[in-house]
């Protein structure tokens, strides 16, 4: 199992993985194109390309020629990076691959000199929150955005001294 930097030409492949990985979340929380048009379950290659144009770096997890997941890292400030689009295909879950992707971007953020990594999740997704807590993240705050049908929980993890 390898994790490598994704290229812009792989945006369609990344979008396919993201859509497939987030489909169950959309179904569980009733998220549709009408209620949550920017939810990752609706991700397109154009979205991934625009993110890359803004400086978001994507990483692809592969087992030989078969991709099993991806993750993105955005440098928000010199001290803070955002972990985004963590996606593991359903048939590859519960094998430690999500943690491997998170560990990879934590190391990349450290290499950039960041002091903290943050993420936003569906606040009602308790299992995901608990998983991030086990990885050393802590809840920062929960915010309700007018354009979203769910509250967002922001979580963060300090990088210095871990």
What spans do the regions from the language model cover?
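Conserved catalytic-core motifs of GNAT/GCN5-like acyltransferases
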Residues: 118-122, 129, 133, 138-154
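Extreme N-terminal starter segment of soluble prokaryotic enzymes
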Residues: 1-3
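A generic structural signal for beta-strand entry/edge sites
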Residues: 78-80, 116, 152
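Conserved G/P- and acidic residue-centered "switch" motifs that form tight phosphate/ATP-binding loops
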Residues: 96-98
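Short amphipathic helical patch at the helix-1/turn junction of helix-turn-helix
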Residues: 88, 122-123
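Conserved short alpha-helix immediately C-terminal to the canonical SAM/SAH-binding motif I
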Residues: 101, 125-128
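Acetyl-CoA-dependent GNAT
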Residues: 5-11, 15-91, 102-108, 112, ...
């Amino acid at each position: 199992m390898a994790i490598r930097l994704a290229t812009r030409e792989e945006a369609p492949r990344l979008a396919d993985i993201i859509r497939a990985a987030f489909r169950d979340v959309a179904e569980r929380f009733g998220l549709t194109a009408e209620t949550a048009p920017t939810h990752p379950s609706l991700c397109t290659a154009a979205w991934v390309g625009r993110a890359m144009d803004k400086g978001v770096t994507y990483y692809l997890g592969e087992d030989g020629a078969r991709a099993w997941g991806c993750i993105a890292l955005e440098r928000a400030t010199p001290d803070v990076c955002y972990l985004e689009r963590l996606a593991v295909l359903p048939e590859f879950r519960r094998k430690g691959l999500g943690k491997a992707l998170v560990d990879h971007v934590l190391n990349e953020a450290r290499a950039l000199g960041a002091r903290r990594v943050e993420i936003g999740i569906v606040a009602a997704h308790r299992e995901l929150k608990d998983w991030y807590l086990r990885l050393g993240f802590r809840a920062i705050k929960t915010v309700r955005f007018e354009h979203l049908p769910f509250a967002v929980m922001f979580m963060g993890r300090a990088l210095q001294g871990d």
